[in-house]
């Protein structure tokens, strides 16, 4: 099984390194990352992971933000170039946390007829000084369930919606494959940094 994570970034130097390390240590095999006009040190950090051979970094120069289109392209590339089994479309401030084991352990439990999974996301907000690392400072968790995030099997006809909240595959829908929700995987979101 191979897990590829896609990420859209813009000025994420404060969090992207820790995001990549966390997910590498929890079962992600490769990243496809699209940068859209970062002006901080984000690209320097991404190039380090590219040199290590675990990231494919793309740069979008468009003045417009075509997130759904770019994430769909990355998700399809995960299959065509990296032979992914599962794709997680992520944001730089989101951490995918399995309740047991790592991400590979989680995906091994998914029935073959499930092609996408909706995952609950919880927002964290600041309590203390911004001088602390983001995960130390953000101790308040919003317990109300927000928009779910969606991960999916690697498919050549996958289409990802804006915000990575859903994904669809006409071929899977025709064949009777479906989606499911889970409590065994959650997303922690650190939106204010």
Language-model features and meaning:
Residues 1-21:
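N-proximal low-complexity "stem/linker" segments adjacent to membrane-targeting elements
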Residues 7, 34-42:
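Ser/Thr-glycine-rich phosphate-binding loops at phosphate-binding pockets of nucleotides
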Residues 21-30:
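Short, acidic, metal-binding catalytic loop of nucleotide-sugar glycosyltransferases
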Residues 29, 85, 115:
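Short acidic/polar active-site loop segments enriched in Thr and Asp
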Residues 29-37, 58-61:
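Short beta-strand/loop segment that forms part of the nucleotide-sugar
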Residues 43-86:
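Active-site-proximal specificity loops/subdomain of glycosyltransferases
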Residues 69-71, 98-193:
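Catalytic-site signature of metal-activated, phosphate-bearing donor transferases
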Residues 83-97:
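Short beta-strand-to-loop acidic/aromatic patch adjacent to the donor-nucleotide binding site
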């Amino acid at each position: 099984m191979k897990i590829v994570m896609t990420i859209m970034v813009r000025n994420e130097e404060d969090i992207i390194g820790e995001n990549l390390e966390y997910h590498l240590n929890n079962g992600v095999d490769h990243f496809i990352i699209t940068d859209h006009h970062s002006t901080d040190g984000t690209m320097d950090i991404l190039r380090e992971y590219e040199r290590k051979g675990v990231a494919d970094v793309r740069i979008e120069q468009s003045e417009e933000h075509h997130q759904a289109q770019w994430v769909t392209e990355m998700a399809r590339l995960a299959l065509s170039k990296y032979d992914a089994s599962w794709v997680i479309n992520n944001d730089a401030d989101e951490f995918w946390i399995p309740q047991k084991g790592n991400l590979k352990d989680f995906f091994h439990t998914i029935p073959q007829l499930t092609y996408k999974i909706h995952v609950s996301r919880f927002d964290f907000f600041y309590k203390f000084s911004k001088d602390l690392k983001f995960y130390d400072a953000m101790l308040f968790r919003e317990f109300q369930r927000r928009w779910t995030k969606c991960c999916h099997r690697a498919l050549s006809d996958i289409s990802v919606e804006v915000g990575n909240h859903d994904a669809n595959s006409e071929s899977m829908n025709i064949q009777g494959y479906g989606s499911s929700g889970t409590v065994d995987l959650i997303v922690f979101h650190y939106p204010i940094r």
